[in-house]
Swiss-Prot record:
Any one Gene Ontology BP term: phototransduction
Tissue expression summary: Strongly expressed in retina, where it may localize to pigment cells. Also detected in lamina, medulla, and optic lobes.
Keyword tRNA processing set for record: no
Entry protein name: Retinol-binding protein pinta
Superkingdom: Eukaryota
Mutant lacking the gene: phenotype: Visual response is impaired, characterized by abnormal electroretinogram (ERG) recordings which show loss of the prolonged depolarization afterpotential which normally occurs in response to blue light. Expression levels of the opsins Rh1 and Rh4 are severely decreased.
Function summary: Retinoid-binding protein which shows highest affinity for all-trans retinol. Can also bind all-trans forms of retinoic acid and retinal, but has lower affinity for cis form retinoids. Required in retinal pigment cells for rhodopsin biosynthesis.
Taxonomic lineage: Eukaryota, Metazoa, Ecdysozoa, Arthropoda, Hexapoda
Organism: Drosophila melanogaster (Fruit fly)
Amino acid sequence: MWSRSSSSKRQVATTDGDPERVLAQVQDLSDWLVANPQINGCNTFENLHFFLRTSKFDVERAKKKLKTFYQMRAERTEWFDNRDPQLPEIQDLLKLGVFLPIGPDAEQRMVVVIRTAAHDPKLHSQNNVFKTSKMILDLLLKLDPETCARGMVAILDMQGVQLGHALQMNPKLIKRSVESWTAYPCQPKLLEFTNAPRHVNFFLNTFRIFMTPKIRSRLFVRREGTSVSCDQLPKELGGQGLSYMELSVKWKQLVEENADFYVEQDKYKSKLK
């Protein structure tokens, strides 16, 4: 539960045009979660305000997002259970840097690089790759909700992709992956595949099947480079920011320092029948 503290009012006043109305909307969401304990969502001001902002301050839309998000976390146990940063399989993928937040683009949206071929498909399961990626994404939402609320720009770097990587992504897993994008409160505004091999569209067509028309319209493929304008682009993408290795070290440390955060987050999943 939360209260209408002065800090909450200050937080709302800095981002929203009608603070009192927004506070009332957050209270509505809080009361709704209490009345629907099976959803078992995080009932803090910060969390509810984030869902409200990313729903364009539509309370009913925010309720649907909350319900979908916490149901996904309950159903996808392979991604959201036992998220100990010290697990060997998680450590390996953190070191490799499979999911690297970069910073805001020119439109102040959060840019992330997803390195689709950083892992060895003979050693690392795709579910563990997704698990590690979502651990970092969840922490990113906590550390920089302001930028994330404006949307996510994902650069999917396919450098080094091999047949083994494609074979890991069966249609069932692709469907679940796409569904998870839309279940998160922060929506992808751009999905740009770069360093893509010639046959990539055959692979991406399976993704497109499960995408909504809106998400499908935001997917682009490049042979090299990126169209994203971001001062912090990594060197590997032609920018002046930290390298993939430096970003991997940074986010590995952040995840390890926030181990308690994952224990707390584990409490919030819908109660499945």
